Amino acid sequence: MNLSQQNQHSNPITEAAKATFPYSVPMIAGFLFLGIAYGIYMKALGFGFLYPTLMALLIYAGSVEFIAAGALIAPFSPISVLLITLMISARQIFYGISMLEKYGIHIGKKRWYLITTLVDESFSLNYMAKIPPHLDKGWYMFFVSLYLHIYWVLGAAMGNLFGTVLPFNLKGVEFSMTALFLVIFAENWLKGKSHESSLLGLGIALVFLLIIGKEYFLIPTLIGIWLILTMRITKLETKLESLK
């Protein structure tokens, strides 16, 4: 084996890229399916190939991208979008705290990309990863996040192209965002041992809907849910602990 072959064999970037691909493969189906749904949804709203592709590349936040898509065709309401995004993505704060050590300054500039691409799946894979000692941990986590990012962007691009090339009937596909949130709510309901916070959210939304009307109830509802849950967080945590 000559010197160049030895250098190539010992290249930490190449080794990490090869090792992480099989680890990320189980996520392909989910990322591509949701990405394709997002691309088709964007097509139904009248946006071309570049919009979903660039939004998937730069926003990279699943359900937030569906919100952004709807916001692009809705009356300008940045406060509503901001509040919804904060509520949906608040869990990222806890992901970030959990990954402080793994994503520390010791891995160099790669940490900025890792922080930017910290989504549910990359958190799960990188947090639970049993990285072989001969691999560079920073590059390993970097490529896990990169592959997931690529799967999502490809899915969004493919979905929009399919919406253009194939004779899909896209009427009603805009309901997919509503369906997405219904599925998330149902999943949390089934997994949760206590439904108090979910019932509070539904109750507050219903009250404001009846009082203010459907045109303006969203922002008061979000603020109300945040205030009530903040005031009751200690009681809710105690109740959850007793159910474990």
UniProtKB/Swiss-Prot annotation:
Alphabetic keyword roster: Cell membrane, Membrane, Transmembrane, Transmembrane helix, Transport
InterPro entries: Brnchd-chn_aa_trnsp_AzlC (IPR004471), Brnchd-chn_aa_trnsp_permease (IPR011606)
GO biological process: L-valine transmembrane transport
A single GO cellular-component term on record: plasma membrane
Transmembrane segments: 21-41, 44-64, 66-86, 139-159, 165-185, 199-219
Family note: Belongs to the AzlC family.
Name under which the protein is recorded: Uncharacterized membrane protein HI_1738
Organism of this sequence: Haemophilus influenzae (strain ATCC 51907 / DSM 11121 / KW20 / Rd)
